[in-house]
Amino acid sequence: MKFAFLTSTPLSPTEGSGTFVGIRELERALEALGHAVEIRPLRVRSGFHTLDRWLYNAGLVLAPPDADVAVGFDLDGFLWARRRRIPFVASLKGIIADELLNERGRTRALLSIQARWERRNVARADRVLVTSRYCAGVVERVYGVPSKRIAVVPEPIDLEDWQGRFARALRRPSERPTILSVARMYPRKRLEDLLEAVALLRRRLPDVRLSIVGDGPEGDRLLRRHAALGLGDAVVFLGEVSRNRLAEEYVNADCFCLPSVQEGFGIVLLEAMAAGLPIVACRAAAVPEVVPDGVTGRLVEPRSPERLADALEEILTDSRRRKDYGDAGRRRAAEFSAPGVAQRFLEAAREA
């Protein structure tokens, strides 16, 4: 089959975040199975993302995709879909109407506009793919899509690629227990809760260290909170890094923490488990579907630095528990291998 992937999300790990990773992993997996994939990316950028997304979609009307099946990611395809001549699948990597609930001000207002476009997109699609049962429920409840038109296809991970990167990564000698977090700095990621947790944890584990990979609109506010808590070199902000450098951070950490209160899936959780890291995260949104509590790590109530600190201490001070969670995490990550997820995608797309 020939697929046209429609996406106005920047195709770079720096700006596209987990959406970029998921699209690229799926593209490679489908091509490995003998299918053709043409990505129709965003080419012209004004600096105003919502405007760019509308212009991109207007352009699809003027130059329609040529394929057996078109796949529009998130809101993409919403203008073209009403006059399409080929099957159309809407693949939602995150539900915009759900994500905006944790945003503020101008960002929330712009996301509200995008959510209306996404609603139109899923209404016009022959099939709607989501990454988790949680997202399926949100799409049915908020966008009014009947459950029979929705299929769950999780995010894929290229285990062979990551295992190669882990094997080549530099191991740095360190006596300090190290926590790693990888996230775009949005309010919904709740990284301030992790900073608070580290401040509490230092009273019990004075040498604990937190490395944060990622950037975003909350960056300045997090730096100010870091200073106010007096965390000093206990926290390192690494910004955006290459995949090779990210692999190095994974193999040099003792534990992975993502305190997010809203995740449609959480592809970084797969990456961390593939690296054998025990997970501490929040019992929120789709996270429990990816991280079984007490099997690959610990899930705690959202917005609770105290419970985060307790769970982190439990893992960092128990080497046997770290190993058991890490081994289980590797097995769990293997359940989302890219070839298997690509097959699930194909089955769902053929029903469009």
Label every model-predicted segment.
Residues E240-V241, E248-A253:
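Short alpha-helical donor nucleotide-sugar binding micro-motif in glycosyltransferases
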Residues A109-V128:
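Membrane-proximal helix-turn-helix segments that form the acceptor-binding/catalytic region
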Residues V69-V71, R83-L101, L129:
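Active-site proximal beta-strand in glycosyltransferases
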Residues R171-V198, S211:
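Conserved donor-binding/catalytic core segment of Leloir-type glycosyltransferases
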Residues P278-A281, V291:
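Short hydrophobic beta-strand element within catalytic cores of glycosyltransferases
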Residues D293-G294, R298-P305, E314-S319:
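Conserved acidic donor-binding segment of nucleotide-sugar-dependent glycosyltransferases
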Residues V261:
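Aromatic "clamp/platform" in nucleotide-sugar-dependent glycosyltransferases that forms part
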Residues Y134, P156:
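Carbohydrate-associated surface elements
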